[in-house]
Every structure is written in C-alpha cells, then in structure tokens.
C-alpha cells in the first residue's frame, strides 16, 4: 500500500539518519574498512553559466586511495528502481562534484537502500549497492 507523502518523507529522512550513524558498517560492506576516509554530505547551488546543475549529495566517502564513493540514500518499501531521471541526477551530481571541487579522484556511484536494487540498464552504472541489512550485520 502507498504511504502518504509526509510519512514517506519522514521514513526517507529517518533512513538517511540511520545510514549516517552506520558509516563503519557501510565501509565494511564496501570493503574499505582499513582505508582512511573523510565522510561528509555535500551541496552546491546551480550555476548554469559554469555548467553546474546544483546538487545535494547525501554522503561522500572521500578515501585516501583517491576514490570518492558518492552515496545516494534511497528509502523504498521494496527493491529500488533506478529510472532515467535518477540516473541523470546521479550523473549531474558527479559532474557538479568534479567541476566545483576540482577533484581528480575516481568517483564511484554507490546506492544505499532498504531492500536492494532492481537490475536494469541504469543499475549497471552503480559501483556498489549497500542494503539496510548490511548496516546491522
């Protein structure tokens, strides 16, 4: 059954908060427990003149091995489906991060979701998927 928008919004925010409290478990699932990291969220305003779309990134894991996991946190009542719109949003976030920060690090799109992801052409672009169960393993 579909939940009211306000409830779904609350669940999404609560899920993001749980994820932020379980960074060590996320790093373990990604196989980077032993890598020195800095974890933050990130935001930039739109600036069309400079090719910046405007982005809010739920979690960035900047790794000492010159990789950034760009983590999208998505609450869903079932497997999450990456649509063309979501794929474009992730690509825009990667572009914004590169342009604004000037990073030369590799950027790995990473999905953190409740029940995994529906396999499709867009999900193939993800480097990693972390599920709710992984946070409590």
Model regions: which residues?
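A cross-kingdom feature that marks ATP-driven nucleic-acid transaction machinery
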Residues: 1-137
